[in-house]
């Protein structure tokens, strides 16, 4: 679990940051400690952006850390397929002022067996 004065969160999956060939899931939860509303989460692998699902019910986490289960729900997940040679994963959050801020970063390894090139954006 990661925590600061404003929020706490955890990335529960995957348990290893060496990715298999193909698609994989990244999942966890995020809770504001101040009552601030956050609008979205996104994930970056190097310069590629992945949209995910933010706001999945996690009553176990919501009850434990917030004292009630319900909106805003804490869970999130992303399905990603890291490109060959991918090195860095970053989780970013969108605040109510429409500003993206880095929440967390993790070095990663993508196997050499992935033949697709990183798409040009």
Where are each of the predicted segments found?
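Basic, ligand-binding patches in group-transfer machinery
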Residues: 1-121
